[in-house]
Amino acid sequence: KQMSVCDPPTKYLQAILEGGNHTPLPELIGITRQPSVKEDGAIRTESGYDPETKLYGDFKASDFTVPEAPTKEDAERALNGIEALLKEFPFEEEGDRSAAVAAILTAVIRAQLRVAPMFHVRAHLPGSGKSYLTYLIAIFATGDDVGASNFPTNDEECQKLLISLLLPAPPVIMFDNLTTDIFPHKSLCMVLTEPVVSGRILGASRVTELSTRTLILSSGNNVGPIRDMTRRVVPIYLNPTEELPVTRQYKRPELLEEVKKQRGKYVSCALTIIAAWIRAGSPKTPSLRTLNSYSQWSDLCRYPLLWLGRPDPAQRVFEVMTEDPEREQ
């Protein structure tokens, strides 16, 4: 059966709004396009509304297969499956590959996270695979195509753009091919550290509250986060060895279509990694530097990779914070 988007009947919406008493309506904090991970590591595979997580699952359960009690060995196999998708990307360091995997984990469970950092793919030359990587990551959040937006030049423009983008509760917001650094626009900073923001809808006089449970991605050559954005963005560096990266021949030129067709398989890999880490007792690295505002994200998207022997996916965050020439401004 094919599903299509449609609005509910106006008369029912009007009756609900005029009724005033909305207590019978369950709270909805987000929409997920795949199964979710519970606090005990169990996977909720049923679609529809989940009163425990307050999420609405919009997916076909039979597309996803996760072991009932995943082990570390299951997690290692799942991680190998995801890393195989990243094999042809020219990551500058292994930590950048780890950050890309963390972005994929974030994409899968973004609706469950109160807040999550933005991910920015950076390279020195055109044709390095920046946009391709962001679109690959986006597939893990939604099987639909994602449209890209231009990065706003000032905070007023940024606020208007974010309100319009967040209004339909999208799984992904993407800023592609940035030509300027990622400025710390106040509205963007809030979206990255607050689960709900308020704003005035364009063309209307009313103010509304909007959920920020959306994965935010960006890419650009020789640009990145500055000042207060450095702690809100996880950079991923690509560094191809070719003089003209755009001429490179790929062994899997149709990778995006491959992943779309087998999305359930690869999303299940990400869920297996997180669930196995939780079932193992949620082991943490005591000496790991904390990333303020993103403790929940670190628990579910950072520590599992360290547990599996991968570099810290947030290492670049601390490097950029230290090296930022404008950090005192």
Role assignments for model-derived ranges:
Residues 1, 11, 38, 54, ...:
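Context-gated lysine
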Residues 1-86:
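Conserved glycine-centered beta->alpha loop in an early N-terminal alpha/beta scaffold
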Residues 2-4, 9-13, 70, 83-89, ...:
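Generic detector of short, locally flexible boundary/turn motifs and exposed helical patches
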Residues 6-10, 16-18, 27, 74-77, ...:
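N-terminal start-of-chain detector that recognizes signal peptides
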Residues 23, 97-103, 112-119, 140-192, ...:
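Feature primarily recognizes SF3-like P-loop helicase cores of small DNA viruses
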Residues 31-41, 56-64, 89-95, 118, ...:
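Short, mixed-charge, low-aromatic patches
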Residues 40, 107, 124, 219-220, ...:
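Structured loops at beta-to-helix junctions and adjacent beta-edge loops in soluble globular domains
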Residues 48-170:
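P-loop NTPase catalytic core of nucleic-acid-dependent motor ATPases
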